[in-house]
Each structure stands twice: as C-alpha cells, then as structure tokens.
Amino acid sequence: MIVIVDYGLGNISNVKRAIEHLGYEVVVSNTSKIIDQAETIILPGVGHFKDAMSEIKRLNLNAILAKNTDKKMIGICLGMQLMYEHSDEGDASGLGFIPGNISRIQTEYPVPHLGWNNLVSKHPMLNQDVYFVHSYQAPMSENVIAYAQYGADIPAIVQFNNYIGIQFHPEKSGTYGLQILRQAIQGGFIND
C-alpha cells in the first residue's frame, strides 16, 4: 500500500489520481496507524518550507516518519525539500533524511523556475521535459540522479538510500511524468 502523507499543504488530489492511474492502492493519511502500514510513503507539497515543517511537527508527523525510515519515501516538489536537513526558506530545519541544505535558486533567469524543462541524466529514461514550479533547490551532490539546466544546474531527481526526491511535478508532466513516478515507486533510479 502507498500512503500519501496529508499535512495540509500539498497537491494531494493530483498525486493520488496519478498513483491510482498507475494501478496502485493508495491511501491519504496523517495517522501513525495508517502510515506504519505503508510499503511506500509519498510526501507531496506545495508552499513554504517553514510553514510545512510547522504543520508536520504540529501533527507529530516528523516522529511518525522518523520511525518509518526503513520504508521507501518519495518526496515531490516541496516534499523533496522537506526530506533535507535544512532550508534557507524561513531558516528552518527539515526532516533530515537526506544530507544537505535547500537554498534559493541562483540564476540570471526568472525565479520561480516555472514551466517545462528538460532532464539531464546518465539514466536512460531521464531525458525528456517535465513541469517545474519552485524557487528553492537542493544542492548538487552525488545523490543527484537528474538535473535541469536553468542558468545553473538544478537538481530534479535525487536518491539517497531509500529516499527519492522529485523536484518537478510528475503528476503534471503527462505520460512521461507518470513513467518516472512508476519507476520511483518500483525501486528508483540506481542500479537499473
């Protein structure tokens, strides 16, 4: 079972619909009882990092997620950023599952990074356009599986142990986005 974590700030209905379209059983919850039963946990998100972490802590989801670190966790957009240690957006601590700091995009192009952009990767399936909406980015590191070029290299997919972060919106990226979401659910992008 796949559980989408509901902390009040997210693109939950679109993500749920996309996962159902792929044929998976999916439940939306913010309770330990349900999240503890998940095989895969999806952390969606749209909004401000500090506000999201405040809600996650208010709902005790940080503790619930911390006791489920043996499970695959997929963060989408803000959800990916929340898995990192810290963000400059609101100078807030994150969940700390992936090492690094989230920082504002530094580019001569307009911010937010909004619209379709091509993925760059050594992975054979990660080479098409996907839909981005964000002003902050993860650091370039050995955990980056794919990135987009937007006046600077912007991490688009990261994988660290059982954590997968997707900065763009696969649920808004058409059939190709759904293929990426399926690959993330099935095992990720390392050692294919």
UniProtKB/Swiss-Prot annotation:
Active-site residues, Swiss-Prot/TrEMBL: 77, 169, 171
Key words, A-Z: Amino-acid biosynthesis, Cytoplasm, Glutamine amidotransferase, Histidine biosynthesis, Hydrolase, Lyase
Entry-linked Pfam families: GATase (PF00117)
Keyword Lipid metabolism tagged: no
Catalysed transformations (reactions): 5-[(5-phospho-1-deoxy-D-ribulos-1-ylimino)methylamino]-1-(5-phospho-beta-D-ribosyl)imidazole-4-carboxamide + L-glutamine = D-erythro-1-(imidazol-4-yl)glycerol 3-phosphate + 5-amino-1-(5-phospho-beta-D-ribosyl)imidazole-4-carboxamide + L-glutamate + H(+); L-glutamine + H2O = L-glutamate + NH4(+)
GO cellular-component term (any): cytoplasm
Secretion signal span: none
Superkingdom of source: Bacteria
GO biological process: L-histidine biosynthetic process
Pathway of action: Amino-acid biosynthesis; L-histidine biosynthesis; L-histidine from 5-phospho-alpha-D-ribose 1-diphosphate: step 5/9
PROSITE patterns according to UniProt: GATASE_TYPE_1
GO molecular-function terms, A-Z: glutaminase activity; imidazoleglycerol-phosphate synthase activity; lyase activity
EC number assigned by the record: 4.3.2.10, 3.5.1.2
Domain Glutamine amidotransferase type-1: 1-192
Cellular localization per UniProt: Cytoplasm
HAMAP family reported for this sequence: HisH
Function: IGPS catalyzes the conversion of PRFAR and glutamine to IGP, AICAR and glutamate. The HisH subunit catalyzes the hydrolysis of glutamine to glutamate and ammonia as part of the synthesis of IGP and AICAR. The resulting ammonia molecule is channeled to the active site of HisF.
Oligomer status and interactors: Heterodimer of HisH and HisF.
Name of the protein in question: Imidazole glycerol phosphate synthase subunit HisH
